[in-house]
Amino acid sequence: MQNYLIYFATLILGVAIFYVFNALGSQTVMLKVSSNTAELIGLMNEAMSVVSVFVSIVLGFLVVYASTFLMKRRKKEFGIYLTLGMGKTQVAKILVIETLLIGVISLVIGLLLGIGISQGMSVVTANLFEADMTNFRFMVSTSAIIKTIIYFAIMYVIVMALDVIIVSRAKLINLLYAGAKAQKNHAKNPVVCVLVFIIAAILLGTAYYKVTAGVRTISDFQGLGIQIAKGIIGTFLVFWSVSGMLLAIVKRCRRFYYKGINSFSVKELGSRINTTVFSGGIICLLLFFTICILSSAMAIRNSMNHVLETCTPVDVQFSKLYSYDAAEDYDMTGHNVEENLKACDIDTSKLTDVTEMILYAPEDINIGDFFGKAFAESGSEDYFKEASMETMHIGEYNAFVSSFGGTTIDLAEDEYVILCNYGEMEPRYNAGLAEGQTVTIKGKTYHPKYSTCVDGIVHISNSESNAGVLLVPDSVDMSDCDFWYDIYSANYNTTDQTEVDALNEYYSDANFYKLQEAKTEAVLGEDGSYYSMNCETSKRLRDNSVGLTAMIVFIGIYLGVVFLISGAAILSLKELSEAADSKEKYRILRRIGVDEKKIRHSLLAQSGVFFAMPLLLAIVHSVFGMQTAMFILTAFGRGGLLGSILLAAAVILVIYGIYFMITYICSRKIISE
C-alpha cells in the first residue's frame, strides 16, 4: 500500500500538470490582445502541443517503470493466489481491474486539481502577455480534458498489457520465492573505487572548465556534445565509486563507526547506493536539468522585463539604412527620413517629441581601435580591425535621450564616449577605455571621458544588441564621412489606449511597407538601390519579446516539473523497495534491544543521504551549467538570475521535500510491520 501511495500521487500530479499546460490554448482565447500577440499565442500553443508529446513519452516511461517495479514487489502475493487455486487469467483480471480503478481515480482527482491550478495559470499568462482580463471567467478546457484522457488511457493500457504478460509468463516457484531472492550486493575494492572516483573527478573537472572559462573554445555542437558526454559518464562513475569509498572512509573513523548503530546505518546506505548506480545517475541528471531549465526560464523572463524597460523608450522609430553606393555619393539634402515619410503619404501628424540622428561610418575609425592591448594582441579580433565604428554627434544623442527623460552626456572638445550594451562587446571596449585608448579624427586626438562604456541605445530593440556607437563632440566635422543610418524617433501625442492601438496598427510592418510600395522611387531613389526604410514600434517589439518569453517560461516550467517529479518518484520507489527488503534486519535490531528511536533515526539518516546525494551532485553540476546558461542568455539581457535560482530552488525543495517526507513515513511503516 505504501508503494502505491507514491505511484498514485505521481499519477495525480502527472495528470494535473499535463492538463494545465494543454489548457493554455483555451484560456488565452479569452484574453484581449493585439493581432500580433494573438499570432504569438497561437505559435506558443503549437509549441506546447509538440512538447506535450515528449512529456507524454517521459510520463509514459515513468508510469510503466513504476508499475513494473511494483509488480516485482507483488510476485509472492500472486504466487499465493495461484497456490490457492486461482488461474492466471483470474489474477490478470484482478490486475486489469486495479489498473482501471487507479487510472480512473487518478484521472478524476488529477483533472480536478489541474482545473484549479489552471485558473491561476490564466493570471500568469495574462501577466506575461500584458493582456486585458476583463473578459476572463472560470474556464474548463474540454479539449485539454479529452487530450489528457486519451494520452493517459494509452499509458494505462500499456501498463495493463505488461502486467498481464508478467503474470502469464511467470513460473509459480519464482513467484512464491521472489521475496526471498535478495538483490546481490558485491563488495567493491576500495582502491578501485578511489581510482574510479579520480577518473570521474577528472572528467567532470575538465567538462566544468570547458563550459565556463573555456566556453569560447567550443566552436560547434560536437565540442559541446563531448563535454555533455563527459559530464554524464562522470556522474555515473561518481555513484559507482561512492558506495565503496563511503564504507572504507567511515570505517577509518572508528569512534563514529562503532557508535550506536552507525555501522549498520553505513552498511545499509552503502548497499542502497551500490544497487542504484544507474537510477541514481539518471535522477541526478534529471534534477540537474530541472534546476537549469527552471532557473533559465525564470531568468529570461526577468531579463526581458529589464530589457524592454530600457531598450524601448520611444513609441515608434523609422530607420533608413544606406547602401554602400549611397554612402559614397548620395545627396542627403531634402532626403531625410521626414521628407521620405511625407513623399510616401505616411501621416506623422500624431507624432511628438521627434528627434533625428545620423550615424556615420568613417573609413579611418575602426571598432578594433578601441579594444585593449590584451584583445588587440590576441589575434582573434581581425574582423573588428577592419569594421567601421558607427559614429554620431553627442548633441543628436542628447536630444534623443531627452525626449524620454534619459540621462544626457556632456563632452569636452577633446573627449569621446562609447555607447554599448551588448555583453560580448563591452569587455573589449572596457579594456581599451581603462587603458585610456585615444582616437585621432582629422588630426585631433580625443580621449575617453569614462573608463567604461555607457549603457545606452540608438535603435529601439527587444534585446541588448547595441554593439558599439562612438559619440563625439558636435564640433567634429563628419561631412566627408559615409552615411550609415538615419534614425527618426518619436512618441505618440495621445495616451488614449484606443488611439494608441490604432497608431501601432497603422505603423505596423504590413501597413508601412504597403504605403512605401506606392512611392518606391521617392523612398529608394531613382535606381532603387540607395537605401532601405524600416519602421519599428515599441508595442511590436514588446509583443514579440513577450511571446518568446512566455513560450520559454511555460516550456521550461513544464519540462522542469515533469523531470523533477520523475526523478523524485523513481528515488522514492527505490527507497521503499530497500525498506521492504530490510524489514528482517530491523526486526533483528529490535530483538537485540535497539530502541525504536535509534531505529527511526537510522532510517531518517539513510533516507536523507539517499535523497541528498543526487540533489547535491546536481547542484554542483548546476553551478557550472548555469554559468554556461548565463553566457547564452546574454542575448536576452542580463540580471535577475539570483532571484530566478532562488525561486527555482524553492519549487524544487517543496516538491522534492514532499516526496522525501512521504517516502520516509511510508518506509517507517514498512519496517514496523
Spans of features found by a protein language model:
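N-terminal Sec/SRP start-transfer signal
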Residues: 1-15, 184-193, 197-198, 240-287
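Peri-transmembrane interface segments
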Residues: 2-9, 20-54, 69-72, 214-233, ...
